Structures are given as C-alpha cells and as structure tokens.
Amino acid sequence: MFFQGEGSIDIPVQDIISWIFDQARYEIEKPVYMDASDTSRSISWRQARTLVRQLAAGLRAAGLKDGDCVCLHSFNDIYYSILVLGIIAAGGIYMGTNPGYTSHELNYHLRVAQAKFVISDPEMLDRMIPAAEGNGIPKDRIWAFTTRESQVVATTGLAHWTALLKHGEADWHRLDDPNHAKTTVVARLFSSGTTGLPKPVDFTHYNIIAQHTLVYDAHPVPFETSRILSLPFFHAAAAPSAHFSTLRLGDPSYVLRRFEPDLFLTTVAKHNITECTAVPPIILTILSHCTTPKYSHSLQSLKIVRCGAAPLDKTTQARFQSLLAPDATFTQVWGMTESSCIATMIPYPESDDTGSVGRLLPGMEAKIINTDGDDITAPDTTGEVCLRGPTIVRGYFNLPSANESAFDKDGFYRTGDLGYCDGKTRKWYLLDRKKDIIKVRGFQVAPAEVEGVLRNHPRIQDVAVVGVYDAEAKTEYPRAYVVRQDQSLREEEVKEFVALRLAKYKRLDGGVRFIDAIPRNASGKILKRLL
C-alpha cells in the first residue's frame, strides 16, 4: 500500500491559457504584476490578455510552429511571465535559462532543448549571440528583451521584443481535445535529475494546472493575499507560481528583478505582503538584515512563508519564525523540477517546528524503496522516496535512457532523496540525498558538468567533484579533488579554469584538493563517499 495525500480535488483538464483567460475571476483592470522598484510599472489581467494575444500573432508571423522551443534569457521582470504565456499561446514551448550562464553553458542548453528562437536581456547578448549562432539560430529569430529606459540594445541587427506586438492579435492555441492537455508540452525547464548534466524536463498543461490546484485551490486561506516574487523566474521553484498562478488568482504580486535584501524588506513592509517563498540563503540574508532597528519589524505583515530547494536546520527556522507575527507560519516544502515544484507542504494555519517538509499534496502518492529497488513502503521506514501523481512530469526531453532510470514501470519518479513518513503525523522527513547533486544557494550543480570542464584542462589527469557544506553560509559549495598531470599546477589555476567557463554558483568555492588517485569501484564509478 502506497502513501497517499489526504483529500481530493478535481483538476481542470484544459489548455493553460484558456484556464487563465477564458474567464475573469476578479477586477480585470486592477494591477496584478507590479515592479517592486517602480510600482508605476504594472500589468492588469486585461492588459496581460491583450499582450498575450499580440505575442501569439507576432511569434507565428516570425515563423514559430507548434512545438517550437523559445528560450527566454533574462532576470525577473513584470513582462517576463507575459512572454512565457505568449510563447505558449502561439503553440510554442517556453524554456528559461540562468542569466549567469556563460556561452559554453548556453550553447549546451539551447542544443539539448532544441531551441529555435531566443528572447534575451541585452546585457547578456554578448554570451547569448555566439551560443545561438552555434545552434543555427539566425539573428532574425533573436529579440532583445529591453524593458527599461536605461537599457539599450548592445548588439545591432536585433529587433526589440515589442516588434512582436505589431501584428495584431490572434487567439491562443486551443486544444481540440481537452485530454491533449495531459500530453502537450508547454515548458521545458532544466533539472539535474539524479545524475549527470542538466536535463530538459517537459511540463504539460495538466502538470502546471495540477500544481496550482493542489497547492492553492486545495488550501484556501482566510485573508486577502499579496505576494513578493524574488526567486529567479527561470527556475522551477518559481515558474509555476509566478507565470501561471499569479494571473489565475489575481493577487497583487511585486516582482524583484533579482533578490536584494533592502528592497525585499522595504517592499514587504510598505505593501503589507502576506506570502512569500524563499530558499535557505535568502532566509539567512534576511535574518542578518533584521538585526538592525530599521528592519526589525519589516516582516510583521507576512502570514505564510515557505522555504524549499534545500534543507533548513531547525535552529534557523526558529530564529526566522520569531521575526514573524504570532499567527504567521514558516514551514518547509519539498519538491523538485520533476514534480512541477511542490510535492509536500504544511498548509496554513498549521505550524511546524520539527524540521518536517510536510505532507503529500492531495492526489499524490509515494512509496519507499531500498538500495536494490525493492518496495519497502511502511511508516517510519527510511529509504529512497518515489513519487507519482498529476504533477509528475512526462519525463526528460529526448533522453530515453534517463527516463528509463528515473521512472519505474508503475510511473513512480525516483527522487534520489532518502526519507521517511512519520506513522502518527503523516509528515515527511528527509535525511539525505542519494543523488550527488550539489545544492548551492538553492541552485543545483551537477558534479559531472564541472568534472567535464576540468577534464579538458591539459594538466589534469583525473578529477572528482563533491559538495562541501559551509555552516556559516548555510549552503553547499563544489570542491574538486584533482590528480595532477604535473606538480606545478596550483589551486588558483584550477579555480580560474572553471570560473571562465561556468556560472558563478558552479565555481569551486569549496576549494581544490590535490590527491594521488581518485577512488573508483570495479566498474569505474567514483567512490565519492571516500573523498
């Protein structure tokens, strides 16, 4: 018998643009998306609907065909989500990339996702253009996403994204058969999965609507909600809520281009924000700022704070809880890209101080397996947690072998996380990760990717990368164990080699250790537990 989430709720089976725009559920002129740094910049439901229809017409005029993948490369902005919806409305597939990526990384992501179009922040075009050209994407299929007067298009020959708005309006791509909502892909976000390089994960209309339904509709709250959106929009931790739930709910949502503690705290206090989602490094930063008199009471309006993407210790959780109002809850959630974000949570107004990540969402199932893959599902039994349910994605795009190893014959996704379910409370607790993924400030770093870069160094014979935990920073960092080709190679040279080729969060901030040999088993697999 599998573990099952309590309760049940009907999940709409339709295309996601109709789900948002077929019917207005609140005042259509009220601002929904607002720029936290300049609240005069805002977008209402009516404006969003018009823009999405214009983008659908413009992208089709530009040659987009059903199933074409469009890469959006930018920091957060109130128009980011509009572009996401416009891409889907045109029949395309949205793909987001980290603004910190190098050309090397962008080249890989564009290639494996089979991107055909690019919309990029002008500040990042120097890295994006070579990557796009390397994947056969011509400049007439690249647009500059300039949203502020201070930004200028740094590269000539590129159209501004608003050129896509000059082709009139077109109805969005509707699904003739509602059941196609369960098979038609709308987003291709990246996950490290359980092993290897970042993998493109395909989300359907149904996956994303299910995520919203199980998180929000199944758990209504007795107060008017306002949100602050500070997590990166390209990331699966933010995408379902930021791009889809926001306009469905109509709750005022204040967008930060990127997380800035002063702006975050000022916005929460000034606009009486009631809900936010964070990751442990953000929690730690807020704690350090709230020790000053200026911000000591800035969080009093918050009623719901959820923390995920990495474990949070109980001491830090208690410290943050003490900054909130007595009726506020600060709880942990658990999920992953492959579960469309959240899989377990503790709904308001229940609190938790035990370190639990919550209970399964309604309609979700879980089982526990041992190291041999045998089902050992039982309360209070530790093993690898596997998930099944409406939010679990179809799989990785164009990677049949990865799908075969990640999903079993019964449709369960092997999370790689070790945990157990408390038999009395039905709360879940995670103990460790089976997978080798390193979590740096909420971002996932695949050791294989960093190892692959280092193996191209002419003076490195062998290498293994592991995560080391920094207790002060409350995050892991990558550390490289290196077998040198010659003894003249120094730590700073190795660090610089990685820094020039990978994003900042993938750098070797955990240091470099030189050793005589990398421990491996008979099949050649690195024995990282010995490092």
UniProtKB/Swiss-Prot annotation:
Q: What is its EC number?
A: 6.2.1.-
Give the Pfam families listed for this entry: AMP-binding, AMP-binding_C
Q: In which pathway does it act?
A: Secondary metabolite biosynthesis
Write the record's keywords in alphabetical order, separated by commas: ATP-binding, Ligase, Nucleotide-binding
Region listing for AMP-binding, in residue ranges: 449-525
The Gene Ontology biological process terms listed for this entry are: secondary metabolic process
Amino acids binding AMP: R188, L189, F190, S191, S192, G193, T194, T195, G196, L197, P198, K199
The induction field says:
Expression is under the control of the azaphilone cluster-specific transcription factor azaR.
Q: Which cysteines are joined by disulfide bonds?
A: none
- Specify the superkingdom: Eukaryota
Q: Name one GO molecular function term.
A: CoA-ligase activity
Q: What does this protein do?
A: Acyl-CoA ligase; part of the gene cluster that mediates the biosynthesis of azaphilones, a class of fungal metabolites characterized by a highly oxygenated pyrano-quinone bicyclic core and exhibiting a broad range of bioactivities. In the first step, the non-reducing polyketide synthase azaA forms the hexaketide precursor from successive condensations of five malonyl-CoA units, presumably with a simple acetyl-CoA starter unit. The reactive polyketide chain then undergoes a PT-mediated C2-C7 cyclization to afford the aromatic ring and is eventually released as an aldehyde through the R-domain.
Which family, according to the similarity comment? Belongs to the ATP-dependent AMP-binding enzyme family.
- PANTHER family, per the entry: ENZYME, PUTATIVE (AFU_ORTHOLOGUE AFUA_5G14270)-RELATED, LONG-CHAIN-FATTY-ACID--COA LIGASE
User: What is the name of this protein?
Assistant: Acyl-CoA ligase azaF
